[in-house]
Amino acid sequence: MLFSEIKFLIFMSVICLSSSHPILMLSSLILLTLFLSLIFYFIYQFSIMSMMMILIILGGMLIIFMYMISLCPNKKMSFYKKLSVTFTMMLILIPYDSFMTKLEMININKIYSVNFVNMIILMMIFLIVMLTIISKNLSWINAPIQKFN
């Protein structure tokens, strides 16, 4: 792995840990998970592992953060100028011939090959059923995920 990928992973982890607003946390976790899945794909050249990581981790995190966002008050997100300048400078300093140029070589067709169609459909159905069950359970106990007038 190159230095720029390690630098990006560390930076995204620090942003996730230092953010205080759930939406900012969620967006940094989504970026971190997508970046890690791309790294797994390039290391193993096997797309099902990266796809499973995206579906399982992000599916669970979206459900958890959906509940957390409903609990926290409606406050504005505060963006720090120093942090945004650091982030843009870091993106500028990533070499052009780095990991980001390998993104063009991703073959999406490997994900949907005939061998993995059953597993993909099973994972999608599982995530939809889990989301439905959790949202039904929360509406039964009148949790603050929905506001009833």
From Swiss-Prot:
EC number(s) given by UniProt: 7.1.1.2
Transmembrane segments: 23-43, 51-71, 83-103, 114-134
Sorted UniProt keywords: Electron transport, Membrane, Mitochondrion, NAD, Respiratory chain, Translocase, Transmembrane, Transmembrane helix, Transport, Ubiquinone
Main location: mitochondrion
Membrane topology value: Multi-pass membrane protein
GO molecular function, one term: NADH dehydrogenase (ubiquinone) activity
Reaction(s) the record says it catalyses: a ubiquinone + NADH + 5 H(+)(in) = a ubiquinol + NAD(+) + 4 H(+)(out)
Cellular component terms per the entry's GO annotation: mitochondrial membrane
Coiled-coil blocks: none
Cell compartments where the protein resides: Mitochondrion membrane
Protein function: Core subunit of the mitochondrial membrane respiratory chain NADH dehydrogenase (Complex I) that is believed to belong to the minimal assembly required for catalysis. Complex I functions in the transfer of electrons from NADH to the respiratory chain. The immediate electron acceptor for the enzyme is believed to be ubiquinone.
Family assignment from sequence similarity: Belongs to the complex I subunit 6 family.
Protein name: NADH-ubiquinone oxidoreductase chain 6
The organism of origin for this protein: Rhipicephalus sanguineus (Brown dog tick)
Designated gene of the protein: ND6
